[in-house]
Amino acid sequence: RFGALEVAMRQNDLAFEVRAYLKNHPCAAVVNLGCGLDNTGSACDNGRCKIYNLDFPDVIALRQQLLPAGEREQNIPCDLKDPAWFDKIDASGGAVFFASGVFYYFLTQQVKALVQGMADAFPGGVLVFDAANRTAVKMIAKTWLRTAKIKDVGAYFAVSDAKSELSPWD
């Protein structure tokens, strides 16, 4: 079935990037954007970092029941599109943000605004995320985006050439 292997590889790749960042910034904030019930932050815990899991309030409420926050971990209810959550992140030791399967639900302009806002608020921070090209987004739309009632995939975030498409966002 389409997607199972891709999801497993995505999680592996994102965890690799988070761990690589923590090697040079062991006390960094590890921020899971749109966390759902994902435990990548905990899986990458080096014993010194601070872990933040962000998602909508109803998701965080369920997460609190099933995956209570650990000692250096916070579950933060928020809308990622509202920058008020920036103030809740202690990035004094650096910050690595990751979004796993999240930006497919955002319009391109919303992703751009979020990325630019984060760049201003967290200088030197790193953002790791997955993205698909327009063809893959159309395939995804036939499966799980339909469940989310997303119809106009043409407006949603997709990347075919990261360097040429994302570099102008600086």
Language-model segment annotations:
Residues 1-170:
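Alpha-helical subdomain
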